[in-house]
A protein has these predicted regions:
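Short, low-complexity disordered leader/linker segments with a strong preference
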Residues: 1-32, 332
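Short, glycine-/small- and polar/acidic-enriched structural segments
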Residues: 25-171, 175-181, 185-191, 204-214
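Hydrophobic alpha-helix position signal
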Residues: 50, 56, 97, 152, ...
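Short amphipathic alpha-helical segments at helix boundaries and their inter-helical linkers
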Residues: 83, 87, 280-294, 325-331
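Pocket-lining segment of extracytoplasmic ligand-binding domains
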Residues: 92, 173-265
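Secondary-structure end/capping motifs
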Residues: 228-310
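Conserved C-terminal helix/tail region of periplasmic/extracytoplasmic solute-binding proteins
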Residues: 299-332
Length: 332
């Protein structure tokens, strides 16, 4: 009898402990997370959809998306601990931060090649016509500048030799207006703004996706110290973004995605977001591994202008432990 009572009591304790743990897990407050994109295009649509559709909340996250004016300011926030993640590309800013001592790594990659529309003035017909012209960028050393340098490298153009100058203009919308106003000869824009310019006569010199240039485009970057201390937060952010990709790629959700993209890009009409929506469906990958080749390509181009980048190794800039875990568990 005593043995039976002891056995029942032991089982009750185990059940009670398990129930208490389960309740505690459910009741635990969501982790507060700040993600800072520094680009204003469809690339960031994955974040907006995840927010609007409640995927971050689903994975116990309280996420604040803060659009930064440029990558240097975004990295200042990351360095100061005011944000936990940067959503963006390999650039002089992101790689330069590591060179200068930031313990940063790319934990996932969502677009792993160079993309965007190189929109130009009506007088530009070929890449050689860009010689002697002024090209608009969001910042020197930032992602948009890096896109431009990789395109020039592909076309055999050298800004110094060919007298091509850069003018810091601002985000995609402002650069589009500057092309139409004749302030600059061209700039790499998001597909939505490039398509809208094309409708009024300003050509797209090239769809950079067609050039198949390896590049770490949209990716999630964080500090190693944060990853080591809070791997569960990183995992939950990636789970939410995988949910977002699945949602975007389902045609059943087209209207909801268009609504989110229209809101994000501050467009007057939903119809103006269609090109950006089609881009999002095609170019996001569910195999969200960062690309070593793409990061290596960025290091190569940056090393042409500054030798300090030559000491970087692409492999050291990646920590894909969470992505590997997710793949093992069948998340993609």
């Amino acid at each position: 009898m005593n043995n039976l009572f002891s056995s029942v009591l032991f089982n009750l304790i185990i059940v009670n402990a398990a129930t208490t743990c389960a309740i505690a897990a459910v009741a635990s407050p969501p982790a507060k997370v700040v993600i800072t994109p520094a680009s204003f295009s469809e690339r960031e649509g994955i974040l907006i959809v995840a927010q609007n559709q409640g995927f971050f909340r689903k994975h116990n996250l309280d996420v604040q998306l803060v659009l930064m004016p440029n990558a240097p300011i975004a990295f200042s926030a990351l360095t100061a601990g005011e944000s936990q993640f940067y959503f963006g590309t390999t650039s002089g800013t992101s790689l330069g931060a590591v060179v200068n001592g930031l313990d940063g790594v790319f934990v996932a990659g969502f677009i792993n090649k160079l993309i965007g529309g190189f929109s130009v003035g009506k007088e530009i017909k070929t890449p050689n016509d860009l010689k002697g012209k002024q090209i608009g960028v969001a910042s020197l050393g930032g992602g948009n500048w890096m896109f431009t340098m990789l395109a020039f490298d592909h076309w055999g153009l050298d800004p110094k030799r060919d007298n091509i100058s850069f003018r810091i203009i601002g985000n995609t919308g402002v650069r589009a207006q500057s092309i139409a106003g004749g302030v600059i000869a061209g700039s790499i824009l998001g597909y939505t703004f490039a398509a809208n310019l094309k409708r009024v006569g300003y050509p797209i010199l090239a769809d950079l996706a067609d050039l198949n240039i390896p590049f770490q485009d949209s990716a999630l970057f964080t500090r190693k110290s944060f990853l080591n201390q809070h791997p569960e937060v990183v995992e939950n952010v990636l789970r939410a973004l995988l949910d977002s990709i699945s949602f975007i790629q389902s045609l059943d959700n087209k209207n909801a995605v268009l609504k989110s993209l229209t809101q994000w890009l501050r467009l007057a009409k939903t119809e103006d977001a269609v090109e950006g929506y089609e881009f999002m469906r095609k170019l996001y990958t569910k195999r969200i591994y960062p690309t070593v080749d793409g990061i290596r390509n960025s290091i190569r181009v940056l090393s042409m202008t500054n030798e300090k980048f030559k000491g970087l190794k692409a492999e050291d800039l990646i920590d894909d432990r969470i992505v590997r875990k997710l793949e093992t568990e069948g998340a993609f």
